[in-house]
Amino acid sequence: MDSVSSSSFLSSTFSLHHSLLRRRSSSPTLLRINSAVVEERSPITNPSDNNDRRNKPKTLHNRTNHTLVSSPPKLRPEMTLATALFTTVEDVINTFIDPPSRPSVDPKHVLSDNFAPVLDELPPTDCEIIHGTLPLSLNGAYIRNGPNPQFLPRGPYHLFDGDGMLHAIKIHNGKATLCSRYVKTYKYNVEKQTGAPVMPNVFSGFNGVTASVARGALTAARVLTGQYNPVNGIGLANTSLAFFSNRLFALGESDLPYAVRLTESGDIETIGRYDFDGKLAMSMTAHPKTDPITGETFAFRYGPVPPFLTYFRFDSAGKKQRDVPIFSMTSPSFLHDFAITKRHAIFAEIQLGMRMNMLDLVLEGGSPVGTDNGKTPRLGVIPKYAGDESEMKWFEVPGFNIIHAINAWDEDDGNSVVLIAPNIMSIEHTLERMDLVHALVEKVKIDLVTGIVRRHPISARNLDFAVINPAFLGRCSRYVYAAIGDPMPKISGVVKLDVSKGDRDDCTVARRMYGSGCYGGEPFFVARDPGNPEAEEDDGYVVTYVHDEVTGESKFLVMDAKSPELEIVAAVRLPRRVPYGFHGLFVKESDLNKL
């Protein structure tokens, strides 16, 4: 193609795409994804934002010792020639080159029912109390994170690839307001300004040889032409939240944390990407652990190059301490969560790991995370305040594959550790067929002196997304509140387990099913009197979001954690649907006021 015809082609492409965009923005399109109907439209602007604020680096109030890696200045707000060309090329890949999508990355399958995204944000909106009353102990906010793609995917899409959206119900003196906002990540901002998806999807980007090569070339072209800069982060911040050192973070393990805050009205604001005064240069886990006694926070990161695991901590003031690289982990394991005790940190090296052979990944397709059936799972135990890995001990635990940890504690004067965690019995299905996953909660005791490992099942049910009273983190705890998979990732109820009943095969002591066609999310325990050291461990409430797929109505449920049926204390009708998501937490009102 000569220069004249090339110019004509690019000009025509730009005109066509610009016309399509104008038509799309002027007349929203109703799209049906299985049983869910969603409206395709441009994402709305946060009313609490304005252009001046978005274009200036944000700072934390009354704090000057830490660095916010803010989003860069606003990019070109209109469709450019290069953007139009790249978007057209991507449409060609999706339409003509991609092989038929596997169910795990087929948007029509992945985004069915209440997994379908809400395609606009919800400003603070009053909620209706339809049962009981909201206890004063719940003054504060329950916030849950989860994937919600800003744009409906045109090609392969995995559940883990969605942009992070926070759903916060703020409660004050028996009244509640709901707000749903995207975490304004660098990725979100770039794609919002472009008007289309730009950055590659990690879990669904490898889908056949030709398509994978084409997407790789397209990604390189976008970077080289300055459409986005991966140095600014490509994370989604869609996994969880953490509150420590008087800061609230939205987390995803592929990037730095994003600092967020709730306003007095209940609105959610993204402050910016946070690097802890330049000391956190890379990603960190979405499951940091804050010691309820010392106020310190412990975390790690993992990656595809040595050291495959790096352990670190933050002091009670939020100052990051030095890294402890763990070179005794000899292959890149998928390390999503870990546990701490009073004296130790515990890591799980499982049969799920990163696929390092890029040629095989391109040729075979599938997820960049795969199963190694020839590998024996191990648990690694390191002193909590270790300066290096010299005292790290590894223990083989055949068949023990955990994604999440529930709690852990020391026994026998620190010579043994106990770990409570859901063991995934079918680890090979974790990313491709979540409906076939069965997680069996186990109690594992490791004698650090003799190396003997003892295991005992706590429940035969399919349980995950389990929590405890946060005040007992790292200490001997009795009660666990776990979500019932029916099948995963749908959650049909919650059970309460008493792990002290170790002589029984099923330690279930309470259960609450949500009803036919109703599914919920991860439960969270909120203490009735968190400042009372004499309070019983289960004296509090279990809260979660629940959605009725028959009526299309979403609710916020408050359950009595001590009652044998987890009796519903209060139910709040939400002003609109809250999609299923991942992890959340409750932040009390006094802590919200510190943000």
Swiss-Prot record:
Binds 1 Fe(2+) ion per subunit. It comes from the Eukaryota. It is found in: Plastid, Chloroplast, Plastoglobule. It is an enzyme of class 1 (oxidoreductase). Residues 41-74 are annotated as: Disordered. Induction: Probably proteolytically degraded by PGM48 during leaves senescence. Not induced by drought stress. Fe cation binds at H287, H336, H404, H583. Residues 55-64 have a biased composition (Basic residues). The keyword Metal-binding applies. Its cofactor is Fe(2+). GO terms for molecular function: metal ion binding; oxidoreductase activity, acting on single donors with incorporation of molecular oxygen, incorporation of two atoms of oxygen. Residues 1-34 form a transit peptide. GO terms for biological process: beta-carotene catabolic process. The keyword Chloroplast applies. Its EC number is 1.14.99.-. Its main location: plastid. Keywords: Chloroplast, Dioxygenase, Iron, Metal-binding, Oxidoreductase, Plastid, Transit peptide. One of its GO terms (cellular component) is plastoglobule. Mostly expressed in flowers (e.g. sepals and petals), siliques, seeds, leaves and cotyledons. Belongs to the carotenoid oxygenase family. Interacts with VAR3. Interacts with PGM48. May be involved in carotenoid cleavage. This is Probable carotenoid cleavage dioxygenase 4, chloroplastic. It comes from Arabidopsis thaliana. The gene is CCD4.
